[in-house]
Amino acid sequence: LDYTYLGNWKSRAGNANIEPELLTAWLRRRGVDEALITRALHQLDKAAGDSSKSLYDRNRAVYELLRYGVKVKPDVGENTVTVWLLDWASPLENDFALAEEVAVKAADPKAYDKRPDAVIYVNGIALGVLEFKRSTVSVSEGIRQNLDNQKASFIQPFFSTLQFVMAGNDTEGLRYGTIETPEKYYLRWKEEAATGEAPAWAAADNPLDRELMQLCAKARFLELIHDFVVFDAGIKKLCRHNQYFGVRAAQARIRRREGGILWHTQGSGKSLTMVWLTKWIREHCADARVLIITDRSELDEQIEKVFKGVSEDIHRTKSGADLVARLNDTTPWLLCSLIHKFGGKDEGDIEGYLDELKRALPADFRARGDLYVFVDECHRTQSGELHRAMKTILPSAMFIGFTGTPLLKDDKARSIEVFGSYIHTYKFDEAVKDGVVLDLRYEARDIDQYVSNPKKVDEWFAAKTAGLNDLAKAQLKQRWGTLQTVLSSQDRLEKIVEDILFDMATKPRLMDGRGNAMLVSSSIYQACKFFELFAKTELAGKCAIVTSYQPSPADIKGESSAEGLTERLRQYEIYRRMLADWFLEPEETAMCKVEKFETEVKKKFIDEPGQMKLLIVVDKLLTGFDAPSATYLYIDKQMRDHGLFQAICRVNRLD
């Protein structure tokens, strides 16, 4: 790596995350005035040592100074000067150094002092910390040591400048995270040598050496800090290897003005890949503007949420006319546009969207700036039509398609024809192997098979209770003794409800309140019928419907019937009753609070699964990066291809 070795600092006094002598010496060699050095160091020390702020806020303040330079005035009345603490443009011009056994005093006098195994200093600023373990000791021990060190009673202030927090051993290799990264989210770097190349790391004796050489090579280390760090709504995040190589590949395409497709599987961080690529475009392409197009309101909301979470203002266009007006102006630089509903049609009405765009086009229309168009979920059937029409309206724009689902044969041919070849791929099996997502277990259940066969009922009971002791089985048998009668007499939905309730009583994660489940129904009406059935069981108050439906008196106009409630009336009544019971208020006022209801039940489903065990859905919550994860997914709906893949990805996330 060619770092300078600073020595063993076990007995050295005053070890800190900012070593003033080293930083001052580097700045002097750069020709920075002494007064500016003093002021810049003061600002850096102040940001890093502000004990009134959380570690996250201190670290973010330091990162801003490293990334964008320290703004100082040489004297009163003089213009502001930027003092750069790192040379981003020429990485090899920085002083990379390593100290081992860096003894740091604990914040609490009663606590033990700590001694990180190795600290990476760049120009005297601690940017990386490493804990090494023997090959017989798990890397997890090193990760937990890092997490302990960040506790307020130990050496938390030392971490205010750190970007990489790492642990490793010779057999398992290196794991990396950043400040406050939970153990399960520590990452492993993965890289293959390009054809015909023989990098130095390829000859490394063990995975630890190889991954250190890949991750901590001078240029790579600074590039990762400069281009691939994000502070996302209270959580600092680093990129995974697939995000890094995906963005790098896209950068190369952009330089050549060639579009293409980024296919990164569900759950592998596609939204942040979009953020990092967008930020790079803005900094490296003159007059750059980025437009992100989606065809689902949930995706549109989520894209706005993720960009605002990383402090980037994004304008959500209200209509096709609004989009045209914004493109015809020089601001804003970042926009997202939903293919809106038109004439009562569903979301994703491409024809209506394009018609409105064309009607809104002034005679002299020309999109201002250098425009880059991202099309989310580009595998969908209509993306070709959209792309061709948008290309006519925006002839000089560059298009990049994003997808997280496997492209089937027809979709693949169409998507490649429309957007160009793959820029980068990261597939489901790779993500499972890397531990980014979990593999799935699938069980097909045919409820009707039990109706007339007592033997099947006994087999079903035996399979369900495998692993339970005799006492537990006896108690369940007593409770479910009438199961054969129940299954023989009830209609199909009631049988599904009984089946799920049995799981709630026998599956460990569902029994102990740590797990939850989603039931995918074929229609909103069927979802309401399911809810009505569950409301009569022990899941009452712990079950909710989340769909796109919003009860309105207009929905039931002309629906009265002498033969009883129509489907629409029944759906309307069940929804109103569910909302009224949740908010403990009259149905007339509660029915206007669907969005608030959805927010609250989602939060309870995630944070308190024991109190919200089951969500009944149709399409909503099955797609998008912030759709909640679940332990079990029950599908009572015909699903295939992309929709099925996105749905099952609700149950393979690490959280």
What kind of region is each of these model predictions?
Residues 266, 379-381, 393-410, 435:
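Conserved helicase ATPase motor motifs in RecA-like P-loop NTPase domains
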Residues 204-207, 412-514, 531-538:
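Interdomain helical connector at the RecA1-RecA2 junction of SF1/SF2 helicase-like NTPases
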Residues 149-152, 380-398, 651:
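Short, conserved "post-DEAD/DEAH" coupling segment immediately C-terminal to helicase motif II
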Residues 334-375, 380-389, 599-601, 617-619:
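Conserved RecA-like ASCE ATPase "motif II neighborhood" in helicase/translocase motors
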Residues 616-617, 622-638, 644-646:
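A short beta-strand element within the Helicase C-terminal
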Residues 480-614:
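Conserved C-terminal RecA-like helicase domain
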Residues 297, 317-325, 338-343, 524, ...:
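Conserved helicase motor
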Residues 2-289, 298-314, 330-333, 340, ...:
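ATP-dependent helicase/translocase motor core
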